[in-house]
């Protein structure tokens, strides 16, 4: 569009601004990043106004990272507070329509980059602000008036962040007494499909969106005012499994929106057909097989988990709209759900959290589990985690003894089978065994590799066993 110094089109969704092509970074893991939408009476809004508090783009140094907050005020006859989260989540959409401007995450985790090419064409955030507001009013016509304030001053961003956190907390509390079984309709969201094409985000009363920005009430409000938008109703259909949270209606939508890649999603399962993970999730869950437990790491945590991996590495393994068994992306508010990974033990399966996350969700953790979940202050690796869990008598420790007994029983069974099979392989005197191709086998006592699969699902379409012939 000629009135703006950069191109605007949905084709730029998914565009990444790499570090080498970046002019400045706003928010992200090295600083503070915030976006917030507030509904206001129309007489309190100056339509189209852009205010900048702190250094403008022309005052910034190339390659630097700056704190960032975007506060949008919106008004209209149909605009109400219930729509704030819905409008807010579209910020991600519309900013990514702008060429050379990358936007990731949401709420208090915003991460943006302005490319060198785009920065060379504009010296202020004002045209950027006007472009985003133009897109909002075009795509969401119920918004009649809109203004925005950009904050790049550290003290001001900190102030806005503190106020916003209270607003987010109040929003999240609305679904506390509403549960999956109380409603007939869930809601879906496809906002992240530009980055994760097969992601199917399902929002139920007991499961907030992966980004944490959309709860069940937000989905309902969005589908009502924008029926053709990215949030839509899902008839939950027949309850197939109450423990895992499997519904026929969700499975149908999963198959359709993933183009057939997935045929089921179980809302409260960690291992079996888990919810897909996009890339905007607030927390990554990861299985630790050595202790048969699950750890969780949040986006803000900069250290390493006991498995030796950080958030960014595990997020790369988890995201992309896939079902990755052993990893799971979630929104922070899901920790407060009474159905939190209930198919796989719930809080009794959680063994590790970063201390900052543990403090943040303290009210969600059952009292009898608080001192049994380790943090980076307690353990540094798998061995120290094992020791900690034993000392605290964590529920997963009871599973270790059961697993050891299973392994012993399996070994005994293998020995019995081998002993029974041995006489059968000895030919009777004078009897000539027919010649058969030799097939080398490995036994537990003769070296080689032993593989033990537990709770594994293996599908083999076809197996061919043939004799390996020596080359002459």
UniProtKB/Swiss-Prot annotation:
GO BP of this protein: acetyl-CoA metabolic process; methanogenesis, from acetate
Binding site for [Ni-Fe-S] cluster: 189, 192, 278, 280
Molecular function as annotated in GO: acetyltransferase activity; anaerobic carbon-monoxide dehydrogenase activity; CO-methylating acetyl-CoA synthase activity; iron ion binding; iron-sulfur cluster binding; nickel cation binding
Entries under InterPro entries matching the protein: ACS_CODH_B_C, CO_DH/Ac-CoA_synth_bsu, CO_DH/Ac-CoA_synth_bsu_3_sf, CO_DH/Ac-CoA_synth_bsu_arc, Prismane-like_sf
Coiled-coil features, chain-numbered ranges: none
Key words of the record: Acyltransferase, Iron, Iron-sulfur, Metal-binding, Methanogenesis, Nickel, Transferase
Outcome, altering residue 189 to S: Loss of ability to bind iron
Entry keyword annotation includes Metal-binding: yes
Phosphoprotein is among the record's keywords: no
Reactions listed under catalytic activity: Co(I)-[corrinoid Fe-S protein] + acetyl-CoA + H(+) = methyl-Co(III)-[corrinoid Fe-S protein] + CO + CoA
A Pfam family recorded for this sequence: CdhC
EC numbers on record: 2.3.1.169
Subunit structure: Monomer. The ACDS complex is made up of alpha, epsilon, beta, gamma and delta chains with a probable stoichiometry of (alpha(2)epsilon(2))(4)-beta(8)-(gamma(1)delta(1))(8) (Potential).
Protein's name according to its UniProt entry: Acetyl-CoA decarbonylase/synthase complex subunit beta 2
Lineage, broadest ranks: Archaea, Methanobacteriati, Methanobacteriota, Stenosarchaea group, Methanomicrobia
Annotated gene: cdhC2
